[in-house]
Amino acid sequence: MLLSVMCVAVSLLLLPSQVAASTVTLRVSQLQGNLTAALRERAAHLGPADHLVLYFDRAGTFTIEGTVEFACNVEIKGLGVKKTTVVLDNGTDRAGFKAFFDDTFFKVSASTSQPLAVSIHDLSVKLKDHNGIWWDGAEKYAFKLCNCAPVSIERFNCTLRNAVCTNVDLRACSNVTVRNCTLTNYNNCTTGGVLWLRGQMHDIDISANTFYKYGNDECVAFFGADAPVPGDIKRYNIKVANNDFYYVNRGNGPADLVNGVFFTYYVGTSTPATVGCASSNVDISGNRFYMQGLCHTIMGITFSERDTHDNVVIANNYIENSPVAGDQKIRHCDYEVTDLNAARIPITFSGNTTVNNAAFVAPWGASGYCHLMVHGGAIVDLGKSSLTDNVATSSLTTQRLGCRLLSFDNAGGTVNMTGNSFSGLGMLASIDYGDGIDGKVTINADSNVFTGDTRIYCRNVKTVDLNFVGNTFNSTTSNFFLQEFAQQGSLVFDGNMVNTPGNGQLMTHWDNNDKAARRFNKLQVRNNVFTGVDGERTLLQPITNVRSRSVAGNVYR
């Protein structure tokens, strides 16, 4: 035993090239002097073949005042999150000791050819309490790991407040496990997130954690192409499951601070145009999002022209939007999906639940709440999900609120809906974007329940194909389905149950354009039960330009 200790002590005094690979256990209780300086000195003698165990082996609070960088495999551990606390301090220059001058406190930097293993567990880390916003305009990180594998972060608490700083930044790291952690970032400013993963990666498991965020920037983000890899970036076997996410004002900032995008999966506009990302087996499931502050988009999924994807599933998640005090108008979207790749592989949303208790009012006074926004011609399969919007009025507007279930940008897109239940609707779909929609919009709906204002609004759109079969419409208005139509398109409306207050029409025509300009290449309305519709003539009254028509077997009550 004595010989083993002596060998370790000797190895710390030699350069890595002078000794064989070693395992070094560094007990913080045995270090003297400034902790940051001592850790730097010990780490400087270890290389990629070595393994360092940094053990905070006594209960208490320890301070790190500068960057500690490891070029070896490292395990950082304590006695438990309630017994071991590491405080990150901005530091000051004194006696030749450099304070925090880099962009991160703990850094592990490896290469793609020789990744390093990292384990962090059983301790708490927090930024020192302070006034004002630290590092405004110069983003920092508590932990930055580059080209590391495997990475295990478990039973770990990390809290940052009032700083442009991100808790954990993983760059081109694989075989990553983040589990049973509580990660908090109340940056109270424009920049800084909680857990960011960049570049090429595989076998990622982020499960059973609790995330707290307030301020702009993503809580959890997959993005970037930071690893110099040949060809396209590859990401596969990504799982984010059974986590609790809170967007809540518990910092010192204003209550009306807006978060842009809370959770994202993308590559990013800074990636070279010649580089794409091949994603497969991406599972975002069983998570709970409690949104207690202003946020533009809760979850954004984005694929560029060169990106490919397969088996991307967002399932069994729960979203709850809570009321927000104040009088700020805002546009809010639960999910935004962008897919610019021509392959058009569907992205699956299944079994998700959304409950809205917030009054989202757009700057122009209408409802500012959208459930799913489709960009770039994406295809979305939306099944077995539910939405309940409980807010119909607000002191900020005289207009009635309600959720806009679907929206599309100028490239159009396809949404396939099966077995869903949506209530409190302000509009079933808005097919209206800027100067017009050039791409084709397709909505296929089977066995859904739509409750509220169930209109599909079309404006300046070239082509729309609608296929609604076996659905239930509990409409609060007589305009229960179409408000205007595309320049051309088709409508199949079969086997639906429609309940309206009276004088129901399949399409209403309110704008100044000639209604004959709306061309139904195919109009099929069969075997529906209409309550509150006087008959076929009233039902189809504004529809005059039909190429192929089949209307039969309908019941009017």
Task: Give short role names for the model-derived ranges.
Residues 4-14:
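Bacterial N-terminal signal peptides
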Residues 19-22:
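Boundary at the C-terminal end of the N-terminal hydrophobic targeting segment
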Residues 29-40, 48-75, 79-93, 125:
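N-terminal extracellular ligand-recognition/capping segment immediately after the signal peptide
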Residues 36-40, 65-67, 90-111, 131-145, ...:
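Extracellular beta-strand/beta-solenoid scaffold signature
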Residues 55, 63, 69, 75-77, ...:
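Extracellular beta-strand solenoid repeats
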Residues 75-82, 98-161, 177-181, 207, ...:
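Parallel beta-helix/beta-solenoid
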Residues 525-530, 546-557:
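Extracellular/surface-exposed low-complexity segments
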